[in-house]
């Protein structure tokens, strides 16, 4: 293996799990999330020599993943694919084991958030440091903390609504 391949392997191992969760947060589908994960890391591989070290590499990869997910969602919307309906979401939720039901419900709630909120909360769930999230989001760290608080309140309301159904 040459140096680029070794570096890429380390980058993939360090970031793939978090990127998968990010992609899953956008799609709610394992297969689509895996496809987006592969597409993201293909772009990382193709552009690794263009990385300028002005930010953490994980920040750069998150940006690529977010853009890849957004492109995917726009394409899905244009193709008129079925949106997640309450019935489809319920079917998906039943596929999860009882242990994962709450996680599935949380992702369902996350999918109802605005795009910027989904990005932020997914990064928080992946335990990305706040300064890095602020950089990815393009907002100050103080503003980020306020947004996270509001997103958590919104998620709590959504979660409680769905739990009552």
List PLM regions with ranges.
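A short, charge-rich alpha-helical start-of-domain segment used by transcription regulators
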Residues: 1-21, 34
């Amino acid at each position: 293996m040459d140096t680029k391949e070794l570096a890429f392997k380390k980058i993939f191992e360090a970031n793939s799990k978090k990127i998968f969760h990010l992609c899953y947060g956008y799609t709610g589908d394992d297969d689509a999330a895996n496809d987006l994960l592969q597409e993201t890391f293909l772009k990382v591989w193709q552009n690794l020599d263009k990385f300028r070290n002005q930010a953490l590499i994980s920040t750069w990869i998150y940006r690529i993943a977010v853009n890849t997910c957004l492109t995917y969602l726009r394409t899905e919307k244009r193709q008129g694919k079925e949106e997640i309906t309450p019935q489809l979401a319920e079917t998906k939720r039943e596929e999860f084991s009882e242990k994962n039901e709450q996680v599935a419900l949380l992702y369902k709630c996350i999918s109802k958030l605005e795009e910027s909120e989904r990005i932020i909360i997914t990064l928080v769930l992946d335990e990305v440091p706040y300064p890095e999230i602020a950089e990815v989001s393009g907002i100050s760290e103080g503003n980020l903390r306020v947004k996270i608080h509001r997103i958590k309140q919104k998620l709590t309301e959504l979660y409680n609504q769905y739990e009552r159904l």
